[in-house]
Amino acid sequence: MTRSIALLGSTGSIGRQTLEVARELGLTVAALTANSSVDLIEQQAREFCPRLAVLYDEAAAAELRERLRDMKTQVLSGMEGLLAAATAEDADTVVTAVVGMIGLKPTLAAIERGKRIALANKETLVCAGTLVMDAAEKFGAEIVPVDSEHSAIFQCVQGCRDRGEIKRLILTCSGGPFYGLTREQLAGKTRADALRHPNWTMGAKITVDSATLMNKGLEIIEAMRLYRLPLRQVDAIIHRQSIVHSLVEYRDGAMLAQLGTPDMKLPIRYAMTYPYRAETPDRTLDLLSCPPLTFAAPDEETFRCLKLARQCAAVGGTACAILNGANEEAVGAFLRDAVGFNDIPALVEAALETVEQVSALTLEEILAADHAAREAVRAHI
């Protein structure tokens, strides 16, 4: 069970909820990192008194350093700071709650120190899953997923003695705010529309990914990497109520599911306490007041990001890094109102068609593919 954490991405949605859980469980916080949110990380530092606080932005870090002069907390910046936080000797668990490829190097560094990784940064496994899982095996690092779907799968395979017993993993998907709409209806959807998720409160980027269904596509790839399963054994279904968080079907026909309220603190808490469970102060699921649970197939022709993700998962190599980098850039442009909603899959597809794909997977090739994908999207905007 976790006693002390280094939290990468403390000011985002997952980061803030992780600190709520840390407060409940009485965990020590050894390190906090964020991009540039000086006010919030200062508040967090004053409450949790970490040994290390990192702001990626150097100017913001300089301001934080001045504000925390009365504390013993050391303030660092940039990738050097992130790596220092990820390898902090006084943290036994590193929570990777940063968004995007920026989490890859710190995650690998933490793995090389044999840390437990509470993984909320799906891009790390999407782009470099084989490297990450091989490194975890080599250095004896434990990876416990924080995504609600992958936490559900993780819990449902705890009694599985042989991965050969698994027939398939079934990831559930709310369908997002635009479920049931046509491509023509999607064309006029705005940033504000996309950020109104029906069930979950999340950061802007992942909420848009949920609206395009790219989030589910990335999660399919993540599940393949986590459990070393082929694409044919990982499915996604629409479940509007977000009560069943995912399922595992075994070869004997048994199907195990994890149910709960749509609250990210549940998988966060489990990642902190695994292999044990802690009492929760939060509202729990009342089966007698549940709405009817429904399931449906996703519409991959309308929501093409899911289809593109499946295609990249089948190809392998740097295709997934190109997919992810292009999507991050396209979603960023959408959030700036620079492109429309339907432009997101179009830009991702254009990058996949123009950026060279290679089958080998070194860290340098992954980073190069990510950079090229972003440049390709920028060129089309």
Language model features by range: what are they?
Residues 1-381:
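Catalytic, metal-anchored helix/loop core of enzyme active sites in primary metabolism
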